[in-house]
């Protein structure tokens, strides 16, 4: 099976990045064909066989072509080889995926369109532009209040489509973008769950994608970059209509992780994880931890959620921890953690114990968006806090200030 994605390639091309990320998550091989807008797409053959409006992206298969990015997304999801059910597990879930793909286009993309035109064409923003954004994000926030993912219990291409649509809201709305991430935290959590998947990160880096608030563009949209020239702006504006033209971005070499270059430690984290999983915590695993712990090669932290007053429903708090751990997936090799929900059903706190490779907080942990949502306290002397650490490892004990409702282990 041969799949070729015809597209203009640019660090700002969210539609193409969405498709490449979905293909990576689905373990579906897709070859990217960099095209020049105004050439291949304007030929009669292209309009007759690929896209009648002469737009990118187009997916070329052995049987024919598919145009429109969400239609391509559906096709990739139907070819899913990951075993992750990216198009849902049942016919109903498949239809629910479809409804969120429609939502991403008719609601999220439509609400961001004035900001895209403002950034790339210099068009004035309508006075009520943010009203529409808040209306859409309020609806999304309410849906995610009781759910980790948009459909079912696992990530689907619905989450991928909505996350990449959200990207423009966070990056193009100037100062409002950051405020949106704080006001609609469930939506931002879901966004980060998609964007911090290792395969998504690899796709974005390989395409030279930019992160954070967009720099450059129209006045007030960023700093540090000159405004695009007229020709570039016109090409970029076409991105809003699905017809981008950009230059091939240089591939970024994968940098070694500094944690892999640390000297060997007598405390083997994987060995402790096996002890913790297979033996009694108080009598075997905890003593093993203190016997082998290497203070020169590891750092232990307490952490506490900053917004515990917002925790109203236990299952929602559990989902918050689950999403946090998913976004820490790339850190698993270098970390062990226990997160506890303590208190009562409708009034409870998140507290946690973490052990990280190296001295201090690793950069790869600092880069996880959730890290800033917690207050962190380094344990200066692990042996001196043996009782408290043992209680946290065991999910019970006198040093835990409130009853433990449930817990989750990162190992």
Swiss-Prot record:
Which intervals hold domain GST N-terminal? 3-84
Per its UniProt entry, which superkingdom is the organism in? Eukaryota
SMART domains, alphabetized: EF1G
UniProt protein name: Elongation factor 1-gamma
Subunit structure, interactors included: EF-1 is composed of four subunits: alpha, beta, delta, and gamma.
Domain GST C-terminal residues, every copy: 90-216
What does the protein in this record do? Probably plays a role in anchoring the complex to other cellular components.
| Record field: compositional bias (Gly residues) | 214-223
Short name of any one Pfam family annotated for the protein:
GST_N
Cite the entry's keywords alphabetically: Elongation factor, Protein biosynthesis
Q: Where is this region: Disordered?
A: 212-265
PROSITE patterns named among the record's database cross-references: EF1G_C, GST_CTER, GST_NTER
UniProt lineage: Eukaryota, Discoba, Euglenozoa, Kinetoplastea, Metakinetoplastina
Could you tell me one molecular function GO term of this UniProt entry? translation elongation factor activity
Cellular component GO terms, alphabetically? Answer: cytoplasm; nucleus
Q: Where is the EF-1-gamma C-terminal domain?
A: 255-411
């Amino acid at each position: 099976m041969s799949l070729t994605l015809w597209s203009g390639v640019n660090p700002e091309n969210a539609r193409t990045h969405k498709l490449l990320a979905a293909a990576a998550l689905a373990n579906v091989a897709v070859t990217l064909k960099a095209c020049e807008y105004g050439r291949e797409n304007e030929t009669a053959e292209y309009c007759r066989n690929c896209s009648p409006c002469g737009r990118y992206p187009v997916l070329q298969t052995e049987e024919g072509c598919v145009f429109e990015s969400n239609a391509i997304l559906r096709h990739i999801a139907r070819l899913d080889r990951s075993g992750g059910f990216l198009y849902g597990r049942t016919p109903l879930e498949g239809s629910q995926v479809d409804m969120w793909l429609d939502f991403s286009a008719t609601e999220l993309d439509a609400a961001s369109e004035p900001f895209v035109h403002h950034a790339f064409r210099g068009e004035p923003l309508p006075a009520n532009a943010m009203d529409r954004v808040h209306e859409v994000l309020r609806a999304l926030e309410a849906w995610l209040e009781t759910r980790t993912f948009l459909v079912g219990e696992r990530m689907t291409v619905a989450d991928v489509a909505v996350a990449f649509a959200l990207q423009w809201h966070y990056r193009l709305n100037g100062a409002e973008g950051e405020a949106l991430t704080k006001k609609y935290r469930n939506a931002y959590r879901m966004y980060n769950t998609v964007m911090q998947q290792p395969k998504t990160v690899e796709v974005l880096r390989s395409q030279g994608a930019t992160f954070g608030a967009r720099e450059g563009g129209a006045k007030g949209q960023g700093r540090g970059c000159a405004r695009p020239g007229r020709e570039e702006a016109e090409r970029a504006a076409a991105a809003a209509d699905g017809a981008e033209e950009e230059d091939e971005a240089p591939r970024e070499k994968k940098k070694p992780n500094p944690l892999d270059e640390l000297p060997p430690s007598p405390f083997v984290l994987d060995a402790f994880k096996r002890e913790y999983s297979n033996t009694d915590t108080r009598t075997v695993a905890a003593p093993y931890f203190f016997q082998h712990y290497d203070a020169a090669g590891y750092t232990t932290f307490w952490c506490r959620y900053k917004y515990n007053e917002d925790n109203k429903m236990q299952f929602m708090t559990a989902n918050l921890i689950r999403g946090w751990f998913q976004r820490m997936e790339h850190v698993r090799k270098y970390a062990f953690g226990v997160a506890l929900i303590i208190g009562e059903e409708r009034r409870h706190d998140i507290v946690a114990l973490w052990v990280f490779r190296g001295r201090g907080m690793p950069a790869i942990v600092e880069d996880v968006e959730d890290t800033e949502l917690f207050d962190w306290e380094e344990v200066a002397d692990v042996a001196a806090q043996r009782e408290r650490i043992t209680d946290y490892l065991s999910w019970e004990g006198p040093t835990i200030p409130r009853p433990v409702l449930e817990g989750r282990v990162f190992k």
